[in-house]
Amino acid sequence: MRASWVAARKGQANVSQLHFARQGVVTQEMDYVAKRENLPESLVMEEVARGRMIIPANINHENLEPMAIGIASSCKVNANIGASPNASDVAEELKKLELAVKYGADTVMDLSTGGVNLDEVRTAIINASPVPIGTVPVYQALESVHGSIEQLDEDDFLHIIEKHCQQGVDYQTIHAGLLIEHLPLVKGRLTGIVSRGGGILAQWMLYHHRQNPLFTRFDDICEIFKRYDCSFSLGDSLRPGCQHDASDAAQLAELKTLGELTKRAWAHDVQVMVEGPGHVPMDQIEFNVRKQMEECNEAPFYVLGPLVTDIAPGYDHITSAIGAAMAGWYGTAMLCYVTPKEHLGLPNPEDVREGLIAYKIAAHAADIARHRPGARDRDDELSRARYNFDWNKQFELSLDPERAKQYHDETLPADIYKQAEFCSMCGPKHCPMQTKITDEDLEGLEKSLKSKGKAKLSA
């Protein structure tokens, strides 16, 4: 679809959506997004130009179906997949991608760290994906020197970053906000640094006694990104990994740097979103969202969860979806899903499904709470189907039709029960929705009360 769109742009010094928007140009991607989001083209262009919306759309990802991340668009969900040195292969990752797209992932991140040819799995994922693909390039940078922090140099980082752009990666998590002066702030934490990328950069700075190379070479990265229209996802290396560490000095110091980097990227006309926590008590979520908007000039916020309690391993898709719904309500643009395997192991395809459905619920609930036009239409349609005992319509409108039908059919499997005016919860005689109050019923009741000298029915 996009091959003809991007053909004329290739070779230009800057092909970013932000660059075109600031020139007053509505690209085909902006037009496509406007139709998907039911927004005016002019508003999409203005939001992209302002930096409040991004359209991650690498010119080399030609089978991409463009989408938007920003406060003016619907709340989005990202799904993480990826192979590790201990598990998975290319076929398994493609199966996860297929499931992620099927169950509504708006973007997918390939977080592969080893165990496969990283270029092979990434290229396969990009070629198969209609949604934007994100990566964390420091993983492959370290893998390229066989895990040796000592041998890892600045050029290794930039080489891998450009390779990902060439392959068609739409956004990259760049951990440029972690500075050497932030490291002492970590000492008082309960769980230290929990970001893998942040941990790699911290080790690099401690060994080489030099500033974070992703910070010192940030302008060089911007020059790379604008040639491909790759977007920044500014990584939060110091995100809290437990309730105890939420909103601490380390997290907020890095956030301030991320705000400065946002402006530097914008100066190059490069698109930016900013990553956020993590593990945050419910009473601190609004503060975290507002603080990011303030420090980062309303660049789209992209949060992992946040988890609102730390005591439920195996159920962290639930503990985090609670926080995600709240974060989305307060203005977060994209939610990174958490699966039941979080903190325990690499997710399998069923974990991907469970995590995604939990987060589609959270994002949809946020859109309703934000009074996004049309957000509740599907809810109302399903409710009408429920009231009319239209079981097949209910299944069709569900976020997970297969699960809804499976649960219904466990007790009432025969097709005849798809026309029944009850389910197995209440049975045929006790379903309250069988009580239909008509105008004739109310007229008769009104007359009866009047004849008995009783008070009128309330309006």
Curated annotation (Swiss-Prot):
Matches recorded under Gene3D superfamilies: 6.10.250.620, Radical SAM ThiC family, central domain
Broad class of enzyme this protein falls into: lyase
EC number: 4.1.99.17
Pathway(s) of this molecule: Cofactor biosynthesis; thiamine diphosphate biosynthesis
Binding site for substrate: 80, 109, 139, 175, 195-197, 236-239, 275, 302
Keyword S-adenosyl-L-methionine: yes
Xref: Pfam families: ThiC_Rad_SAM
Superkingdom of source: Bacteria
Cross-referenced InterPro entries: ThiC, ThiC/Bza_core_dom, ThiC/BzaA/B
UniProt feature coiled coil, ranges: none
Glycoprotein listed as a keyword: no
Cofactor note: Binds 1 [4Fe-4S] cluster per subunit. The cluster is coordinated with 3 cysteines and an exchangeable S-adenosyl-L-methionine.
Cofactor(s) the protein requires to work: [4Fe-4S] cluster
One Gene Ontology term, aspect cellular component: cytosol
UniProt KW keywords: 4Fe-4S, Iron, Iron-sulfur, Lyase, Metal-binding, S-adenosyl-L-methionine, Thiamine biosynthesis, Zinc
Gene Ontology BP terms: thiamine biosynthetic process; thiamine diphosphate biosynthetic process
Residues reported to bind [4Fe-4S] cluster: 423, 426, 431
A molecular function (GO) term: 4 iron, 4 sulfur cluster binding
Catalytic activity: 5-amino-1-(5-phospho-beta-D-ribosyl)imidazole + S-adenosyl-L-methionine = 4-amino-2-methyl-5-(phosphooxymethyl)pyrimidine + CO + 5'-deoxyadenosine + formate + L-methionine + 3 H(+)
Binding site for Zn(2+): 279, 343
NCBIfam families given in the database record: PRK09284.1, PRK13352.1, thiC
Role of this protein: Catalyzes the synthesis of the hydroxymethylpyrimidine phosphate (HMP-P) moiety of thiamine from aminoimidazole ribotide (AIR) in a radical S-adenosyl-L-methionine (SAM)-dependent reaction.
Protein family according to the UniProt entry: Belongs to the ThiC family.
Protein name listed in UniProt: Phosphomethylpyrimidine synthase
Species in which this protein is naturally found: Prochlorococcus marinus (strain MIT 9313)
